[in-house]
């Protein structure tokens, strides 16, 4: 993986990116494992919180067609750093926002950052998972990461909510994003696998 600096052992490089992919998949603007506590703590209706989840999913779906154009324009380090910063900021401010349109917008942006980070990690370790680009191998691994992270996210949310407070899940994810940013700063360098591709005409 040429984006890593020389001192990072080759054997652990893919595992680092797999870890980063899991951290992005654990994230969300709000966490439905603490749904009832959020309804009481933020004085919102159940439908309001569910709309946050829909906004998060919409952010991932709408941004998905742009992922390859972004990959061809920016370096892996730039994309992962910006995605981690976006998730970090969204998780820090989401618990303190009760104005619903703004909260939905924050969750929408968080979804865009989430899919950006996950895509960058998984696309770079695809050949490590299956050197022949066999999608019958790659997609089961991808589903394990995505679906496993969804279940793990609810478990962590429930644990933190029971012992501390429902907002601690947001702080936990913010802490993971700080770790991701440190990895990107220390272990990763800017690397282009092809010439810079302009964003002109991205809507086509």
Residue ranges and their predicted role:
Residues 2-7, 189-204:
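Juxtamembrane intracellular "pre-TM" segments in multi-pass secondary transporters
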Residues 56-58, 147-148:
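Short hydrophobic/small-residue motifs within alpha-helical transmembrane segments
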Residues 90, 101-110:
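Paired small-residue
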Residues 62-100:
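Conserved MFS/SLC helix-loop-helix module at the cytosolic interface between two early adjacent transmembrane helices
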Residues 138-192:
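Helix-loop-helix hairpin linking two adjacent transmembrane segments in secondary transporters
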């Amino acid at each position: 993986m040429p984006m890593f600096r020389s001192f990072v052992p080759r054997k652990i490089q893919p595992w680092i990116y797999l870890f980063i992919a899991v951290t992005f998949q654990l994230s969300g603007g709000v966490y439905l494992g603490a749904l009832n506590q959020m309804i009481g703590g933020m004085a919102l209706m159940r439908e309001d919180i569910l709309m946050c989840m829909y906004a998060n999913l919409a952010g991932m779906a709408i941004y998905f067609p742009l992922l390859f154009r972004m990959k061809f324009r920016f370096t892996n380090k730039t994309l992962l750093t910006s995605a981690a910063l976006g998730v970090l900021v969204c998780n820090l401010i989401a618990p303190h926002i009760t104005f619903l349109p703004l909260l939905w917008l924050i969750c929408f942006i968080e979804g865009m950052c989430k899919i950006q980070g996950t895509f960058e990690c998984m696309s770079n370790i695809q050949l490590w998972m299956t050197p022949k680009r066999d999608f019958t191998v790659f997609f089961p691994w991808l589903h394990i990461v995505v679906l496993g992270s969804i279940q793990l996210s609810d478990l962590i949310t429930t644990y933190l909510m029971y012992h501390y407070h429902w907002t601690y899940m947001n702080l936990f994810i913010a802490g993971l994003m700080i770790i991701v940013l440190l990895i990107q700063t220390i272990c990763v360098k800017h690397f282009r696998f092809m010439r810079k591709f302009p964003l002109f005409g991205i809507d086509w």
